[in-house]
Amino acid sequence: MAPTPDRDGQDKKVCLGVVTGAHGVRGLVRVKPYTEMPEGVAAYGPVETKDGATSFAISLKGMAKDLVICKLEGVDDRDVAAALRGTELYVPRERLPRASGDEEGWYYADLIGLRAVGLDGRDYGRIAGVENFGAGDLLEIAPAEGGQTVLMGFTDENVPEVDIAGGRVVIDPPAGTFGDDAEAERGE
């Protein structure tokens, strides 16, 4: 399958995790995985930085709580490993298997840039990200009229339809999510 161009015309990449710091003195790194199974961080071949400027062969070395300990090729001492803190690790979308659990087979990364449309057709804006700060998945929506992004729970009730082919996510936001009373019609 050919990669799908993103908004900037670049091939789509999926972030598998982020380096949280060094582990030991031999250049190992701690990685917070964004994959379903933590070891998935090292399962899809070499990883690269978001801009694609640096690529690393990656191997799994162990686990530490909710983090994965990895070896990145070319990172051989603690100082270099520590300097990578905050670096997100990506792979091209086409390296990943078809997403399971949904007949369309999509990943959260596929939602970025899609229109967020209400049940009534109202244009709420575009999906800017999918976040999880520990209490569940959240859609980050950049409002159509501009301003700060809005976070909304990514639940079946709030997001009744994801239409990748149509370039949209149908949302039913809770009252007050977008700072107006239009959502109050939901009857809650």
Swiss-Prot record:
GO BP terms, alphabetized: ribosomal small subunit biogenesis; rRNA processing
GO MF term (any one): ribosome binding
Cysteine disulfide partners in this protein: none
Keyword Phosphoprotein: no
A Pfam family matched in the record: RimM
Chief localisation class: cytoplasm
Family recorded in the similarity comment: Belongs to the RimM family.
Domain characteristics, as noted in the entry: The PRC barrel domain binds ribosomal protein uS19.
Function according to Swiss-Prot or TrEMBL: An accessory protein needed during the final step in the assembly of 30S ribosomal subunit, possibly for assembly of the head region. Essential for efficient processing of 16S rRNA. May be needed both before and after RbfA during the maturation of 16S rRNA. It has affinity for free ribosomal 30S subunits but not for 70S ribosomes.
Subunit structure: Binds ribosomal protein uS19.
UniProt-recorded name of the protein: Ribosome maturation factor RimM
